[in-house]
From Swiss-Prot:
It is found in: Secreted. This is Chitosanase. The keyword Ribonucleoprotein does not apply. The active site is at 79 (proton donor), 97 (nucleophile). It comes from Niallia circulans (Bacillus circulans). Aids in the defense against invading fungal pathogens by degrading their cell wall chitosan. PROSITE patterns: CHITOSANASE_46_80. The lineage of its organism: Bacteria, Bacillati, Bacillota, Bacilli, Bacillales.
Amino acid sequence: MHMSNARPSKSRTKFLLAFLCFTLMASLFGATALFGPSKAAAASPDDNFSPETLQFLRNNTGLDGEQWNNIMKLINKPEQDDLNWIKYYGYCEDIEDERGYTIGLFGATTGGSRDTHPDGPDLFKAYDAAKGASNPSADGALKRLGINGKMKGSILEIKDSEKVFCGKIKKLQNDAAWRKAMWETFYNVYIRYSVEQARQRGFTSAVTIGSFVDTALNQGATGGSDTLQGLLARSGSSSNEKTFMKNFHAKRTLVVDTNKYNKPPNGKNRVKQWDTLVDMGKMNLKNVDSEIAQVTDWEMK
């Protein structure tokens, strides 16, 4: 029977008192003080880098964790069709482009008929050094990892099957020394030259540096006419950053889908990402979550 004037039970009274206390505490201290920060609130682009790597990138490129996180998203879309780039430290695959195995964040290669000066050996040498080798070498790293292979001239010849070799690389995904070696090699082979070329022209923006890095790792930093060096030589001499980058992107678009750099039309869409950000005026890649989502919203072929 329902009695509107009945006395509340003791349990109900305790509940009401507890609720009132909770409400008072929440109003005084805030929900965050009671529960701690939410996972979403605690998440920061800086968390995607070790403190050492983050400081290294800041010192040498002038860009912070948020900017590098966005650069890596833009690079990883055409490389892996995925913005979650941190999953690919242990990536390994023979993509049958005659460049050997493709490895890690920036697609280091072991070498082949179309790549006689690969960057893979540098990565393995850096790993051997990071693990404490007194005289680091690519061969030393292979031995350390139990990989059957050796340097043959400038090419890293792997004798294990793809399943065995890539299985061992995938196990390095969370290896701190491997991650350190990955960023050191990435910087030495591609990032340093890209930053130098930007600064020589008076440019320091994240989009310009990122676009140059993307070009270098995709088409080579120096050497032939399709490399970053070759494209820069054909992009004019404008001191206006936007004007220069529009010219640079136009030149890159002409060659980006040739020579197995990308499968058409993925290359054109790759360049368009950066070019659209230039048009948007989002050169510093700060607070651009929606813009990154927009420019990477294209279908890989």
